[in-house]
Every structure is written in C-alpha cells, then in structure tokens.
Amino acid sequence: MSTKKYIQNREGLPNWSNPISHAVVANNMCFVSGQLSVNRKGEFVLGSILEETERAFGNFFAVIEKSGFTKEDIVFIDIAFNDLKDQPIVDQLYSEYFEENKRPARTVYQVESLPFGGKIKIMGTAVKDKLELLQERT
C-alpha cells in the first residue's frame, strides 16, 4: 500500500503562496517541486547565476531534509536554465555539492523563461533504501 506525505510550508522552507507542495513523499521516494531563488518569506531574490543557484540548491536541500531524506538519497536532479551559457558555473557548484563518484543523474536544459525572471529552477527525486525506512518506522 502506498503512503503519501505532502510537504507544504514547513518551518525553514520558503513560504509559498501558490497551491503546491514543496515535495511529495510516496513510499521510499521523495519528489521535490521546482526550487527557485526564493527566501524563507517566499520572496524571489534576483542575483547572479551563482547567487540564484546557491539559493535554489539551498532550498532544494532544505526540502529534502524536511522530507526525512538526506543529500546522499538524491538520485535525480532536473535543472532548467534561462541561459545555458550559465551551465559551467552551475557545474562547478554541483561538483562541490556532490561527491565525484556519487553524483545524482541529471538533466539540464534551457527554457524561454522562469517564474519571476529567475535564472534557474532545480527539482529532483530522492530514494531511501527500504530497509532504512523500515528501521526508521520501528
């Protein structure tokens, strides 16, 4: 049987005013909605690609943690840019955030525009070992 947990507007996460969940946890998987350069009040913060990427990844990692997962559980990341010329900067941060031989699968692509005029959006999936989940529930 599938159990679902909806992660919405928890302390330490951006306070979204739109009707979405930060993440949905189903069984041993966590599906994280697109994270932007948004502060904890839910206000978009424009900046350089480096600043926006750090903030978006910070939000992404916070959602993962509030969902009961860790960075090591992340198996897939989807990154949308408004300009692929920014990819080398994001690649550098990505290599700092994830160990060389344990990096999640990833897609990157360019979109025409992102909400609030942002430069990047990050979403992804994390998976816990079922044995690990069983141990947490007992």
What are the roles of these predicted feature ranges?
Residues M1-G58, A62-V75, F81-T138:
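N-terminal presequence-like segments and the immediate start of the first folded domain
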